[in-house]
């Protein structure tokens, strides 16, 4: 499958689906967002429907990002993105993931990540998926470790925060061979549907 086409697919699992991000997701994302959700993100929380639409437009406008809305039932619960697809090195990053607090601790983040991992490895053909998170975000670090991601290192002063301080980031990764063996926190067949 051609990679660009692969980024336009809806990814469906048993509890949620990932839809390519669109302007129509703005109201749902705004309802899911609050200051605690955005506490460890390197950009400010959009506080109005106009700001959320601008945020979506910016997310869609960058050549290095392929964003998705996380949809549970018919409710937009959050977002996650593929970043920096590098076909030469065979790697891609998953990041800019956030969910409304209502879905914290429900398994939605893990399911979304597993859908994205399966799609990156099996449909898009990448050999490595990387992640990075704020060193201060213990919840995110634990979630990545439960997925089976390895801690690759710490990068100091990696991203400026909205308050002007600098974020140190912990880098993680999972290799395709580990994922296929089930070392990546998910058995090879998890009922993932690569819908249209």
Located regions from the model:
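Conserved acetyl-CoA-binding loop-helix of GNAT-fold acetyltransferases
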Residues: 105-119, 142, 146
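Alpha-helical elements of the RecA-like P-loop NTPase motor core of helicases
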Residues: 27, 141-142
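Conserved acetyl-CoA-binding loop of GNAT-fold acetyltransferases
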Residues: 145-155
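Amphipathic alpha-helical recognition patches that constitute DNA-binding helices
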Residues: 93, 111, 128, 139, ...
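Conserved beta-strand-loop-alpha-helix junction that forms the acyl-donor binding cleft
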Residues: 131-141
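Generic leucine side-chain signal with a strong bias for well-ordered alpha-helical environments
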Residues: 16-18, 144-147
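GNAT-family acyltransferases
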Residues: 1-108, 119, 123, 128-129, ...
């Amino acid at each position: 499958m051609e990679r660009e086409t692969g980024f336009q697919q809806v990814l469906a699992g048993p509890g949620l689906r990932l839809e390519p991000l669109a302007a129509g997701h703005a109201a749902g994302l705004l309802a899911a967002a609050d200051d605690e959700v955005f506490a460890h993100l390197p950009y400010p929380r959009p506080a109005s429907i106009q700001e959320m639409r601008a945020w979506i437009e910016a997310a869609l406008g960058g050549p290095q990002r392929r964003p998705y809305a996380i949809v549970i039932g018919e409710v937009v619960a959050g977002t996650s993105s593929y970043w920096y697809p590098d076909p030469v090195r065979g790697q891609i990053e998953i990041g800019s993931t956030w969910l409304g607090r209502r879905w914290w601790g429900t398994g939605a983040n893990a399911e979304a990540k597993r859908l994205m991992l399966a799609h990156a490895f099996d449909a898009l053909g990448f050999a490595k998926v990387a992640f990075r998170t704020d060193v201060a975000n213990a919840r995110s670090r634990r979630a990545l470790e439960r997925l089976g991601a390895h801690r690759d290192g710490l990068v100091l002063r990696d991203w400026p925060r909205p308050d002007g301080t600098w974020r140190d980031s912990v880098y993680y990764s999972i290799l395709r061979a580990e994922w296929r063996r089930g070392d990546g926190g998910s058995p090879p067949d998890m009922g993932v549907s690569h819908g249209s």
